[in-house]
Regions:
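His/Asp/Glu-rich metal-coordinating catalytic cores
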Residues: 1-49, 54-219
Length: 219
C-alpha cells in the first residue's frame, strides 16, 4: 500500500492512498495506512494526488474519505478507474482531472507530472517544489525502451527537469532491490504468441486486471 505525506509551511500534500493486496484465508483482509496523523490536521491538507490506477495507490480512498475530505487530483485514465471504484463503493468523493504533462500549484506546493513507464496507462512521477527545495516522488516506474503502453523513458526530459539538485528522491519500484534488469514487456509477446499458437485447445491466461500492458500484449 502507498500513502505519502509532504509537509511545508503548515500545509500537507498527500500522494496516493492505497491498500494492501488481499491475503486469502478464513477472512480476506486488506489494509490501509493509519490516517490518524493527517486526519487530525485535515484542515491543513491541500489535496491528494493519485499517481496511477493501481489498487495499492488508490484503493484506500473510499475507506478513508470521511477522514480526509480533500480535493483529489488524477490523470484522465486514473480518474476514470477511481470514479468507477468510488461509484461501486457509494462514495461521493469528487476527482479533478489533470491532463498528462500539466503542472498544478496547491500552495505552498508546485507539482509537475513526469511520465514514467509502468504496467498501466498515464503513470506519472511527481516533481514537488516548495520554497525549501524540490523532492522527486517517482511512484512505480520502469526504464523500458519499448513499452507496450505509455511513453518510453525520455532521458532528455528528465535531465531538463532535474537540472537543479533535488533534496530527496522518494522511490517506489517493485523488485528494485533485486540485481539485474527486467525484461521489456515487448519481449514477452513472442513467447506468448508461440505458446498460444502451439496450443490445441483453449488458452486461459491469468494476470492482474489492472495490468493494461499485459492485457494489450495478450490481445
Amino acid at each position: 500500500m502507498n500513502l505519502n505525506l509532504y509537509g511545508h509551511a503548515g500545509k500537507w500534500l498527500m500522494v496516493d492512498c492505497g491498500v494492501t493486496f488481499e491475503k486469502r484465508g478464513a477472512i480476506n483482509i486488506v489494509q490501509t495506512a493509519d490516517p490518524s496523523f493527517i486526519a487530525e490536521r485535515r484542515d491543513q491538507l491541500v489535496g491528494l494526488v493519485v499517481t496511477h490506477a493501481h489498487q495499492d495507490h488508490l484503493g484506500g480512498i473510499h475507506l478513508l474519505w470521511d477522514q480526509l475530505e480533500c480535493p483529489i487530483y488524477a490523470s484522465p485514465f486514473t480518474r476514470h478507474v477511481l470514479q468507477s471504484k468510488l461509484r461501486r463503493e457509494r462514495c461521493g468523493a469528487p476527482v479533478v482531472e489533470i491532463p498528462p504533462g500539466e503542472n498544478l500549484t496547491l500552495s505552498p506546493f508546485h507539482l509537475e507530472w513526469l511520465p514514467v513507464t509502468h504496467s498501466t496507462i498515464e503513470s506519472s512521477a511527481l516533481l514537488i517544489s516548495t520554497e525549501a527545495g524540490k523532492v522527486l516522488h517517482t511512484a512505480d516506474w520502469k526504464i523500458d525502451p519499448n513499452p507496450v503502453v505509455g511513453e518510453a523513458f525520455d532521458k532528455n526530459l528528465w535531465h531538463s527537469k532535474l537540472s537543479e539538485p533535488v533534496k530527496a528522491i522518494v522511490c517506489d519500484s517493485t523488485n528494485a532491490t533485486r540485481p539485474g534488469h527486467s525484461l521489456s514487456e515487448d519481449e514477452l509477446y513472442e513467447g506468448l504468441d508461440q505458446a498460444v499458437a502451439s496450443s490445441k485447445g483453449r488458452v486461459v491466461v491469468g494476470c492482474f486486471a489492472s495490468n493494461i500492458a499485459r492485457l494489450d500484449t495478450l490481445a
